[in-house]
Curated annotation (Swiss-Prot):
Record's subcellular location: Membrane
Superkingdom of origin: Eukaryota
TM region(s), chain numbering: 111-131, 143-163, 215-235, 240-260, 776-796, 816-836, 887-907, 909-929, 1003-1023, 1029-1049
PANTHER family tied to this protein: ABC TRANSPORTER C FAMILY MEMBER 1-RELATED, ATP-BINDING CASSETTE SUB-FAMILY C
Domain ABC transporter residue range list: 473-693, 1103-1337
Alphabetized CDD domains for the sequence: ABC_6TM_ABCC_D1 (cd18579), ABC_6TM_ABCC_D2 (cd18580), ABCC_MRP_domain1 (cd03250), ABCC_MRP_domain2 (cd03244)
Name recorded for this polypeptide: ABC transporter C family member 13
Any one GO BP annotation for this protein: transmembrane transport
Assigned keywords, A-Z: ATP-binding, Membrane, Nucleotide-binding, Repeat, Transmembrane, Transmembrane helix, Transport
Molecular function via GO: ABC-type transporter activity; ATP binding; ATP hydrolysis activity; ATPase-coupled transmembrane transporter activity
UniProt keyword annotation of Ribosomal protein present: no
Amino acid sequence: MFERINKIKKKIKEKLSYSILKDEKIDYYNLPCPEESASFLSKLTFSWTQRMLMTGYFRGPIQMSDICDLPDDVKVQKTNPILDDIDFGNSKWPLLKFIYTNFVTKNKKSIFIVILCAIFSILSPLCLKYFIKYIQLSKNEKTFLTGLGYCVLLFVGTFSYTLSQQFLYWFGMRTSLHVRGALSQRIYEKMLKLSSSGGKKYSSGSIMNLISTDIGLFADFFWIGHLEIIIFPIQITALLALLCWIVGWSGLVGFGVMIISLPINTFFGSKMSKNLMLSLGYSDTRCNLTSEFINGIRFLKLYAWEKLFLDRIEEQRRLQLKYLYRRVIFAIFEKMLSQTTNAVVLVSTFSVYSINNEIELSVAFTAITIFVNLRQPIMRLPEAIHNLLGLIPSAKRVESFLQLSEIQTQPFINFNNKSINDDILIDNGTFNWNQDNDDYITNNGDNNNNNNKNEIKKRLIEKSEEEYETTTTTTDDNNNNNYESYLLNNINFKAPAGKLTIICGVVGSGKTSLVSGLIGEIYKVSGRVNTPNKISFTTQQSFLLSTSLRENILFGNEMNLERYKKVIEACCLAPDLLQLAAKDLTEIGERGINLSGGQKQRISLARALYANSDCYILDEPLSAVDPEVATHLFNHCIQGMMNDKTRILVTHQLQFIPSADHIVVVDNGKLVQGTYSELKSKGIDFESIMKTKKLNIDNQQQQQQQQQHDENEIIDENPMKKSNSLIESNKLINIDEIISDKHDSNLIEKAKLLVKEDKSEGAIGLHVYREYFKHGSSTFFFIATCVVYFFSQAIFQMTDFWLSTWSQHKLQGKSDSFYIFYYIIFIGLFIVTLVIRYFMLAHVTFSASKNLHTSLLNSVGFASCQFFDTNPSGRILNRFSKDIAEIDLLLYDLFSDVLYCGSTVVFAICVMIYISPLISLPFLVLIIVYNIIKNIYAVSSRDLKRYESITRSPIFSLLQETFNGLVTIRSYQQQNRFISMMQDHININLRLFYYSFSIHRWIGVRLEFISALVVFLTAFFSLFNSNAGFSVLSVTTAIGMCTYLNWAVRQFVELEVKMNSVERIESYINTPKEGNRFTIDNEEEGEENMINLNEKWPSKGEIEFRDVEIRYRPTSEPSLKNLSFKINSNDHIGIVGRTGAGKSTVGISLFRMVECSKGSILIDGIDISKIGLHDLRSSLGIVPQDPFIFSGTIRLNIDPFNKYTDSEIWVALEKVKLKSTISSMPLKLETMIEEGGDGLSFGQKQLLCLSRTILKNSKVVLMDEATSGIDYVTGDLIKQTLLENFNDCTMLTIAHRLDTIIDSTKIAVVDKGELIEYDTPINLINTKNSKFSKLVKYQTDFHKENEKNF
């Protein structure tokens, strides 16, 4: 028989597979929602979901193409606009009130179902009362048809109540999705509008936490909690009225006990709410730190600071768990009180009733059934109330976020007609980063900035160290938080239309603040600003999306192939595209992790150029490229394709100043502006500035004669030496060969960087549960907890047996007090075991939650860089936010429900079979059917949950990227496009919720029908039982079992669904780690392999590369090939080459950020692959190209391990010209800095990173474009500081500015991953046709030409 069933199943599977998969190109987005076209019967039974369920069961795991569209009323586009009418005002809880008014009360169907459900709740006890009376009749008084009629009534009464509950859940679900979608989208849209001051109050991590945790609590509550608060009081009142009718005024005693328990329940609920609010606060901080940790993971690894950050996160986790544990304790007390109340109600009611009445079967068991029906509302009402109270903190957090200050929607007068002067203007403009402290700004009414010109002239010409210490703006003594805000007070600015305006000034002078004022990113307090409608803006730190290079350039604009090709050529990107596997369709990693700094800047510039805007505002777009490329970009982009547009260029590269039509010199928020000749006439001496950066090679050339070098010193035979420069390559490449409308899908797939998020298939494996219990304590301890649960429930079941005995007075000669006494004993034992079981389970789940997070954090924290390259930060943060939140807040209740309901069902079945053995056969059939239905449901339910988790990651990834690129997105007016993208992501995620809830109802209706059938069969077989007491006991047990069986099945499946979070975390816990953190002496490997690493290593600083080859991925082309050279102790090596040549890879290979695929690197004769990563990285020093500043004090950013004294820190700050800046801050070294160093300029961040390295005083130091964001004068002073402080160190300097490395001991020229030249600067200069000599000649000729222009 089973073989035949399998054959049928196979045929169905094949047929279904063909019918569903025959059109593989089907667009699942366009599949209509089957509910909307379903018949009344299909809607009543939720049969419209069966296509998807059967697909999953017969064909295998369901795919996204099997999931239909959402109903229109659930889509974000429909629900989000409803929130437009919310008025926060001065009312209490405005958000909750608004949701109740606009999402709950307007749903008339749900209110009708609430009333219907309350009415049906008393139907089953009434039917039972008359059935018991019938059972107690003598045989002569009974007829089969009458008995059958009562059985049918019991079936109808039971099923009607449970069916109405299903629709109660259904309408609640729709409200939940309305609220989830609307609030999630509203938070994202609010983030797009946040002002600079508003944005500082929230990080991307805390906003993610709002959506994952707080909005999750909203969705959970408005799924059913909001209706429970309405229906439970009605239900309790109706059932109590029925109880009083059955047992008289004795029922009021029980009611009185309930009333007394409510304030205590409310107290516990408020305590739970308070502790939840506190835990959410620490959860926010934890998520912020985790987000910061993931975003800065490369820098933390380079500094060997992972453990420091992990400890900071763990401390916040410890505080979060402290309050979560308190919440669990109060939850246990609340559960104990609820269950104890039920027992006390029974004891008190029957004790009082027995005084004047005899306990009869119809009275006792009808009362018990009423109490069974009362048990859920009595237990769940306090839970619903404290869930509402717990929602209040989340509501306040969401309200606070939604009320943050926004950017000014109309801060400017946009000109688009000839009547308005089309120059870009600021008239008497006063700007501030924080719009909440206008009093901080003083308006002196001085409209003439000429009074400042002498001071600026003095600062530009004089180059003393003291005068060029970096400064910030005036600080308000009354507000310690204003130090980071550059103040622009009463300024006048002009950028002539169709002309080039260059803005220059020292580090921290206010250049970025000025352009931020032009695009509306800082608050305009007063004045007038004229800007065009369409502006392209490039930030100093390039913003790139995790998508293809082409999409980053198009940035939402339509493809114009001819213009696109011109942009690629103008931005010198053709040679870079030629090296990429899928050309411009190659996927760029998050924040452009697989690109060099110069490539990122050129892509950002290409985006601005392609947009074809009225005005281009470019903030330091040339700092990360070599001088030749910078000149090309200036001539072909800024002065080429942009030539007829208004251009505002912020730059430190003053060689371009003579080409400017208008020049603005900024110093400390003050402006002097005019043409070049006008500024010269005012005394601004640009010639002296230019002379500070001229390459000083004349003396070196005079000291040595030109000579031909030995082949051993210079790699003349290297074919790469003969290759063209980037500019020449750009000219020679046929652009049509690399840019095309036709694409090779195989190449595109191969070039993908991000890996697809894994989705497990099938049931949650036992290994996931074992892993959970192992982290909780042990599997044995959990089994012991289960035993206590079953023992506790066995004692509770004895109370029903005892009541049955009491009602029939089977023990002759015993008074009611005897029965009451032992009834109380059973209740007391039950309460004791109740306490034990809850605390045992709390220990398991709480320990698991704590240890899983620790394991996850350590696994991710010490994972390889490739892991972060291929997994977007949003996906990783999803584990730390949503998945951890589900484990923290849900698994305890789910395990408790499953064990409680499961043990109740087991004992109920045992009782029914014991009383009526004949029921065993139909029970077996029903159990088989039950199991089939559960299996059909479980397959799709698991897959939907897994897809829900996966579709959540794009929401967080987009949110993270949007937060990082807010300025760029707003300047390009791309908000609507990103809003639309988020709407799509949220709708897809809601779709998984919708169909997951729908199949919940599908199984619910069927299980409730089978449960009602169980009641019918139990009642039917009891008709043939001569023992009335046992017959009634079996029927009441069956009625009680229905509720618990269905709840057990639902909660078990929900538990399995939520264990998906454990499964997802476990997959990350098993992430391969980088390698050993510490060096291990292993004598077993032999003396030749032993590492003897002392504390002073490296003491010499000798470095040797031996045939090094490095690949970022096993399948990718090598980034470094056959690299062999030696660096002597105390040598200063300059590493040059075009952008993307492999310079940074050479540097970071010393830190083993990428392991050598071939060859080895030795420092002081020791192969660094044998050195622990922490030992290696902590022994080296680095100043990275993109500075990393994390949230915390300035002291913590400079000296996180508290190793140095204040005086040592101040000396380091003085050496990098930051002492006066930091000392002007109110709290000095204890001043708090926001994530990413908001409030500090790019150059200041670089200098702060430099101070860390100076303080560390390592023997080997890597400088990776460490001064690219610093003006030349400050750069010269920093260069002198480096020579003084690192004179006895081995230093590798990666730079595009040749003046930075011209005094190096040797120069290494890298091109296409190979070392093509390596010698002293003078030898390379004197070598005919050397690449370095060409670079020097180019810059020298360029500077000479510029000096003529000056």
